[in-house]
Amino acid sequence: SSAASDVYKRQIKLKEFRSYHPDFISVTYGAGGSTRENTHELASYIQNDLGIEAMAHLTCVSHTRLEIETLLEQFHQSGIENLMALRGDPPSGKNHFQRPSRGFAYAVELIESIRALNGFCIGAAGYPEGHVENPDKEADLKHQKAKVDVGAELLVSQFFLVNEFFLKWRDRLHRGGVRIPII
């Protein structure tokens, strides 16, 4: 099948990463523009077959809390210890994110739930220029600190072009008491 062929091609490409000795490889949710199953499959391949730490992304989009718990158990059973907990973008065709029925509205809720299960290392998104949906930058910083307070162990910065934005954001987080790695 075409999907199996695509996964195989990705695995061949991923083998090339070993020579760079990365600390970890981040695997987006719905890896390769497909379903969430590829995230688990590729993260497991990276972790178990290549021997490189994998950080699997997990989002709140379209999941109940029970579905999230099932996904967490699958990651745990596969030896995946590192997760990037994200709210996620609105589903295709939607302008705004809406809490799924019996699901999570915010990444902080997802992080808190993950922290209660299986001892995962949890990464969270950081926004040097502020989150696009929150014009209040101070409130935005408080939201990022809240992720740390409930269990995030590192912040992974969103893309930025001006280093000054990142450095000021990092310094404001430090002044606010955030003492975890910021990548």
Where are these regions (language model features)?
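Short, small-residue-biased leader/transition segments that mark boundaries at the very start
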Residues: 2-8
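Glycine-rich, proline-tolerant flexible connector loops at the mouths of alpha/beta enzymes
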Residues: 22-40, 90-102, 153-169
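Conserved, mostly hydrophobic/aromatic
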Residues: 25, 75, 147, 151
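Glycine-rich anion/phosphate-binding loops
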Residues: 60-74, 101-105
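Alpha-helix-loop-beta-strand connector modules within alpha/beta enzyme cores
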Residues: 36-56, 102-124, 167-183
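Active-site/ligand-binding-proximal alpha/beta "capping" segment
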Residues: 112-155
